[in-house]
């Protein structure tokens, strides 16, 4: 027990704290606000408080809890809405109304709800950390696997039968090799700043299919990969994040609203329960954990929210699921680091951010990955991290953007000019990149189409060529170009408008199957080849642009039938043959 000697915003300095540990959770002041020790000097402790500190004064007590900041992991996580330190917001609302009272806490997982547990092991079985001892149908989509905590191994000496139990009840007892008996419950606690262990990290060879053509075709994200979406205000970061949360083929989605506006979290809360998961037809909320830490909540909790989210994601990864984690936005988290660092009177780095910003950012993204999990069976799980970055004024030389780009492998650059032209998703195809293209091309070629990589490269080359020609067009106008180059501009425009542009609010176009993506690209590139043949035969581009099939190609993205789209190849051929006849005469 100690007492407060100084309060500066979210930072509190307390005296007489000998015996405390770094990152220990403490209760500050008469109200018992939740805080965490972030620095120890002699018997003084510097505490970062996760709630509003107004009204706290020197002399008030500080109580240590002896535990580090931990999350509860067990049945009941899915469909929940937490704040940055895993307090369940719906329960806090029933206790204190729409605004959270200070010093309030509630258990993250319900202690009264009974879950139907089915055991998967029997007495006498040998188990190690990570082994699945039973399953609970948590939602109609996700089966929650109850695992032995990583630090326990030995022989099962007691296991309950199939039935309904609360998470507090002991469901198994394990006799360790030293004779000690360990009790296993349905939930475990885990410190958020510590990675959950695994056997082996695997290369990212499987794409995270998102149904967004720009992303899947040109700048793919791998399962277990890391991606950043930087962009100025209004360029569509949050809508892109929502699209990925809705349609990516991960089994579990963890969405962290970190320092963003409250209405953006409200959007998620209103939309997700109504939206259906394309694979199961059930509401999307049933596979989602939401962490709402909006901009009007205390700054310090932003830092915790990122770690809380990734720890929950790692827990589902350990069950063998593919998890997608959206962090919106990591800039707000970095700003929280900057504020705390400033109040600690540390030496500032670039733009006032702390000098350790790079290592903090790397530490967070490093927890992504595709892994072989702990346990005697061979499970593979992954955590894919997609972080939005909102630099002031859309400036990509911002330290947060630069430090993020050092560690992530996919960069989706959102462009305000494209957004103003109503081109969504506003991902700039000239500045974005993905370093996973070569590692996942085998998956595309074996499962979707053997020509995927060649077609992607050809389409990309056309778009690059268009940007070179744009310079000339600005100076001399399009009419001065030779016919071949006019044809390149025509086809590149088709690629942009009929392929890259995608309507997030159209029931068909919001999600595009990999097979449909490849078919659409083949139709456009087939049109390009016929166009080049026609130009060589002396047919002017104006005539080609008038072909009726062009309009049908423009509408193909709204057609759910892949066979009907493939028919356009034949139609293109027929209409070009008619052109050849007309000009041949």
Swiss-Prot record:
Coiled coil: none annotated. The keyword Secreted does not apply. Belongs to the ATPase alpha/beta chains family. It is a peripheral membrane protein. One of its GO terms (cellular component) is plasma membrane. PROSITE patterns: ATPASE_ALPHA_BETA. Keywords: ATP synthesis, ATP-binding, Cell membrane, Hydrogen ion transport, Ion transport, Membrane, Nucleotide-binding, Translocase, Transport. Disulfide bonds: none annotated. Component of the A-type ATP synthase that produces ATP from ADP in the presence of a proton gradient across the membrane. The A chain is the catalytic subunit. Has multiple subunits with at least A(3), B(3), C, D, E, F, H, I and proteolipid K(x). It is an enzyme of class 7 (translocase). The gene is atpA. GO terms for biological process: proton motive force-driven plasma membrane ATP synthesis. It catalyses: ATP + H2O + 4 H(+)(in) = ADP + phosphate + 5 H(+)(out). GO terms for molecular function: ATP binding; ATP hydrolysis activity; proton-transporting ATP synthase activity, rotational mechanism; proton-transporting ATPase activity, rotational mechanism. ATP binds at residues 231-238. The lineage of its organism: Archaea, Methanobacteriati, Methanobacteriota, Thermococci, Thermococcales. It comes from Thermococcus sibiricus (strain DSM 12597 / MM 739). Its EC number is 7.1.2.2. Transmembrane segments: none annotated. This is A-type ATP synthase subunit A. It is found in: Cell membrane. It holds the Pfam family ATP-synt_ab_Xtn.
